[in-house]
Amino acid sequence: MKSWCKNLLAAGLSLAMLSACSSSDVEEEPVSELTAIQATVFPEVSWSASVGDGVGDYYSRLTPAVRYGKIFAADRYGAVMAFDEASGEQVWRKDFSEEFRDNALAKNKGARLAAGITAARNKLFIGGESGLLAALNAEDGQVLWHVIAGGELLSKPTVADDVVVVSTSSGSLEAYNVDTGAKLWVYDMQLPNLTLRGTGSAAYEAGGFFIGTADGKVAVVVKNNGQAAWEQAIYNPTGGNEFTRMADVDMTPLILGDNLYAVSYNGNLVSMELRTGRIIWTRKYSSFNELTTAGLSLFLVDDHSRIYSVDRRNGLELWSNSELVNRTLTSPEVYKDYLVVGDFEGYLHFIDRSTGSIVGRIQVDSSGLFSQPIVVDDKIYVQGRSGKLAVVTLP
């Protein structure tokens, strides 16, 4: 199978869109086998719990949220749960399939949760493939309001003051009042003929929502009125077919001071001026994962699961690691002096962020890890495809 066909599968593109990838194409690029490492850190699972039935093999960007002394997590099928942050004891559980069976989900195929969780203003915000967006009381799980958005919700909602926005698969950014669910405005974005299955969440800064688009742009939308302040292409699609012209920005723009950083599939990693969108530098990388940062370094995982450290001042590559190629790595996150990433076999890898060397690993869930690890204080929270929620620490 051609490597770009395989990458589209990893990114969540539907199988129907892959009819152009024939078995007679170039042989499938192999998955890297894990090899012995010189371990210097020895992670442990502090506690774990089960979150419903997990997400199975479905595309999902469900991630836990840690706030208010609790950990909030959900499964694809409608179970939303809160656990005590210290002990892991279950505090409450809400079943969306039961809650909305006779109204919002009556004509759909169950909850199919895929977007969230976002915890803010003593509420939880979560959505799914049905278009359902719901706000819950963080204290007891009571549903405060719900709406049906104009398309599938595949990434976390973003909350800014009294507004929550969601990016839909139909190419719109929709804004709602956080307390009532009243729709405030809709910003429509151009949708190419073929896109990756996924959307990025918006970042918020200085009165604007910064959002990546499916046609290779970053746009800033004014919170108060839903109008675009500017749009800037970070990659101009080229190629002889729809696949090679895909240029989705399926990540949350990373804002650091007066600069914004974004990366596109098939395209570029860029540094932009926050106020105007002017591109400061650009480098050739292809990714649908989130960026993270520490010090003067940006860290990214590309569409082949290669890991990079890049100087955020000028885009110069500091190191790269190809030991985990095609292991369907999660987005990276910084933990102390390390970078942590999960893989499709459920291993959480610890990488020295100054050298790129793998210095530790632990298998958390053999069904695989699928979402970016969450780091709070000295703990790492990960969720596996089976529904296992685990807290990993270094002794």
From Swiss-Prot:
Q: Which cysteines are joined by disulfide bonds?
A: none
Pfam families per UniProt: PQQ_2 (PF13360)
Give the matching Gene3D superfamilies: YVTN repeat-like/Quinoprotein amine dehydrogenase
Q: Where in the cell is it found?
A: Cell outer membrane
Q: Where is the signal peptide?
A: 1-20
Q: Where is the lipid attached (S-diacylglycerol cysteine)?
A: 21
Tell me the membrane topology, using the record's own terms.
Answer: Lipid-anchor
Report the GO terms under cellular component: cell outer membrane
Instruction: Spell out the PROSITE patterns in the cross-references.
Output: PROKAR_LIPOPROTEIN
Lipid modification N-palmitoyl cysteine sits where? 21
Nucleotidyltransferase listed as a keyword: no
Q: Which UniProt keywords apply?
A: Cell outer membrane, Lipoprotein, Membrane, Palmitate, Signal
Annotated GO biological processes are: Gram-negative-bacterium-type cell outer membrane assembly; protein insertion into membrane
Give the protein's biological function.
Part of the outer membrane protein assembly complex, which is involved in assembly and insertion of beta-barrel proteins into the outer membrane.
Family, per entry:
Belongs to the BamB family.
How it assembles, according to the record, is:
Part of the Bam complex.
This protein is called what?
Answer: Outer membrane protein assembly factor BamB
Q: Gene for this protein?
A: bamB
